Each structure stands twice: as structure tokens, then as C-alpha cells.
Amino acid sequence: MMICLVFLCVLTLARGEIYPPICPAPGVGNDEAVRAGELLLEISAYRNQRSGRVELWGSAAVNNQVFYGGMENSQIDYDFGKFLVFRCFQVFNNVHKLLFNTVSSATMHLARKRVQKCGHGKMTFISIQVQCSVNKKSIRLSRMSEASLKKQVLRVAFFLDRNNNSWIADKNFQGEDRTMLRLWNELSTYQQYLISSCNNDVKILSELYGEFRQIALPYDEKLNLNFMPVIRSSSERLFRADDLKCSFSRWLGAEGEFAVCEYSGWGVSRLGKIEIFAEKPLTFDMAWKTVKMRSSGAYTSLFRDDVTWGLIPLDKWVGDKYFCMCTNKESGDNVIVTLPEKNVEKSIQIYDEGSAMLSFAEMTSIILNLMFMGAVAVSVGILGISCFVGLKEIIYFIFVSVDYMWPFCDTLLTTAVNCFFKGRTFLRRELKI
């Protein structure tokens, strides 16, 4: 079905302009979220500010919990949403080349002019969504626009009427948009194909999920796709003066308690980085160590923003203290958010290579202190015993023991006795010096 939609875009682009006449507005998403049991696949075309070329951006979501968004060159990870997007891009990569290589030179020149005009960041020109569930099937075509200094979304959607299997158009934009109307007129001729494709998406999803489990299970023994956790508590901090947010939440699911660190805001899915740390006991001290987590990132209409998140089960860690660090990889700035109901000291030492060297130095210092205290204790013990048996007997016992255990120390003992005990014939006779 998605292939059909993109091919229709090819036909439309060959006949006329498909990009908006003015630059789109960033950070604008759709109002509806995907409910449990629904599948959403989305493909968007936008301009990459650094490379200057038009690229595809895809996102996938299942049950409002597993999601991912990425570029054409996104690599698969053990996240189901990433897997869906990866499989989609295997198809869309070829379609994308066809989309921009089969149009006339005049149309392509016009498209490039529109791309060059919008040079203030990552902007979405056109977005196609396919949403399928048992009770609802819809296809949306969205375009971003700015009018009268007010950010708006031009959106048209077809909703499937289950009574007679016909599509109902729901127009939601100001003014006429001939390109949009022409595209939806083309889509209306493929009603039966779209209906059958949407009905088959659930079967395809099941097959992909089965294939995905074979890949993912070696990484995650207990992969639970359909968990519906309940949030218990959350803490969050704004990231400097930007509209970025770093939050750390405690959740309770069917299999126990877990924590989710979420870094959200425009651009964090590409420039953001999150790390979760737990306090782990070392030999002589406590230190902070990185926790292995399940993570994902997305720009998706579900959250209307970029999101990067990480999840850890709390029952696998003995430590009571956790914190999440959100870092902007471009500027290097970061903020730290502690897990609710747990107090973390102001001075946090992260257990990495540098802290490992510090811990080794601390351990060496502790060992030297223990050796010094042991020497003092032995000296005090010798003085105490000498009060009862006499100093001569103690010194005699020590020298005889050393001479017996280490015979090679004869020369050293001879020198020591001659220097310090010249008049002590008792020691000289017993040691045969």
C-alpha cells in the first residue's frame, strides 16, 4: 500500500509541483495518537540542511509504545520500530530514486528552487501516513505551511467507512490546494486496493514480528511488545534555555518495576544522547557505572517532537540510586536528572576509565594506611610483651626466628648484632656470631 502511495506521488510530481509554495513550519505534528492495536507507518520528504539534498524520513509505531524514526541509511537495532522502518526503507530507497529521476527537467528545476528557498533547518515538505486497526483505517497526506506568520498544517485524510467499504474525504486546510486535490483524486481510484492492503497489514505485521523476534531474542531474552505500564512518579528538567526536556520516570509493569529516561525536543533524535547510571559497590567504595539499556529515538507524529529514550529494569540492579544524563552531542552541554524517590549526592562520580584510575589510587592509599597501622600495632604489641618477659628474650626470639627462616640473612644479622649489641655476649653466643 505504501508503495502505491509513493508511486502516486511520482505521477503527481511528473504532472505538476508537489512542494508547497512557501517554507514549511518545523515541529508541527498531527493531533491524533495511535491507540493500542494500531499500526502507523509514515514516510516524509524533507531537505537536509547540511547536504542540501532532499531525503526521506520514515517512522513506525505500534501500540503507542514501540516506535522509531530514521533516515534512509538507518541501521537495524533490536527495537521493533527500528526494524519496521528498516524494512520500509529497503523499498522506499528505490522508490525515492525513481521519484526524483523520472520527472521532467522543468519540474525538477522548480522542485530544487523550492528546496533552496527553505534553508532554515530540517523541514517536512510532504508526509504520507497509513494507519490500520480493527476499528479504524485511514490514510493521511500532510503538508507543512506558514501563512500570516502563523504555523499551520494543511491536511487531508480519507477514512474508511466500514458500512460500505468506501472512503470518506476529510479536508482540513484553508483555501484550495490543487496539488493536494489532484493527488487525492488519484488515490480515490485505488480504493479497493487500499482497503485490501490495509486489511492485510495486520498479517504482514505478524510475519515481520515473528522474523524480528528471531533476530532480537539473542539480545533481549524477554521481549515484551504489548506491555501497558502505569507511571508511578517522574522528575524532569529543562535543558538550558532551549525547549528541550530531560525526564526520568519510574514505571510499574506486569513484570516488575522499570525506569524510563526520555530526552525530547526538536533535533534530539539526531543530536541527543542519553546515558543511565546506577550506583554500584566496588571493593572499598561506591561508584557510578553505566547501565545497559534498551533505547530508541524518533521524530513521529505520536509525540509531535523528537524523542530519544532508554529503558532499564530496576529489579536487576542492587543499587538504590540512579540518574540519567542527557547530552547535546553538538554543543557538549548536559543535564542530570535523578530518579524520583531516590536522593543522589551533589557530587556524582561516574565510573569510567578515569574514575577507575582514581579508584586504584584510593585503594593503594588505603592499603598503605593499613600497612602503617599494622606496623604500629606490632610495635605496641612488642613493647607490651616486653613488660612481662623482658626485652632481651623478645629480641633474641626475633633474631633466632629470622636466622632460622632465612639463612641467607647471616651476614645482615652479624652486622646488626655487631653494631647494636657489641656488649651482649648472650646474643652473640646464641647466634654463633
UniProtKB/Swiss-Prot annotation:
Query: Which stretches face the Cytoplasmic side?
Result: 386-433
Domain note for this entry?
The ER-lumenal domain associates with class I MHC molecules and is responsible for lysosomal sorting.
Ordered alphabetically, the record's keywords are: Glycoprotein, Host endoplasmic reticulum, Host lysosome, Host membrane, Host-virus interaction, Inhibition of host innate immune response by virus, Membrane, Transmembrane, Transmembrane helix, Viral immunoevasion
Its localization reads: Host endoplasmic reticulum membrane; Host lysosome membrane
The protein's name in its UniProt record = Glycoprotein U21
Q: Which organism is it from?
A: Human herpesvirus 6A (strain Uganda-1102) (HHV-6 variant A)
**One annotated GO biological process:** symbiont-mediated suppression of host innate immune response
- In this protein, the residues bearing a glycan are N164
The family classification in the record reads:
Belongs to the herpesviruses U21 family.
Q: Report the function annotation for this chain.
A: Plays a role in escape from immune detection by associating with and diverting properly folded class I MHC molecules to an endolysosomal compartment, effectively removing them from the cell surface. In consequence, surface class I molecules are down-regulated and infected cells are masked for immune recognition by cytotoxic T lymphocytes. Also plays a role in the down-regulation of the host stress-induced NKG2D ligand UBPL3, which enables immune cells expressing the NKG2D receptor to recognize and annihilate infected cells prior to viral spread.
Q: Which residues cross the membrane?
A: 365-385
GO cellular component entries: host cell endoplasmic reticulum membrane; host cell lysosomal membrane; membrane
Q: What is the lineage of its organism?
A: Viruses, Duplodnaviria, Heunggongvirae, Peploviricota, Herviviricetes
Q: How does it sit in the membrane?
A: Single-pass membrane protein; Single-pass type I membrane protein
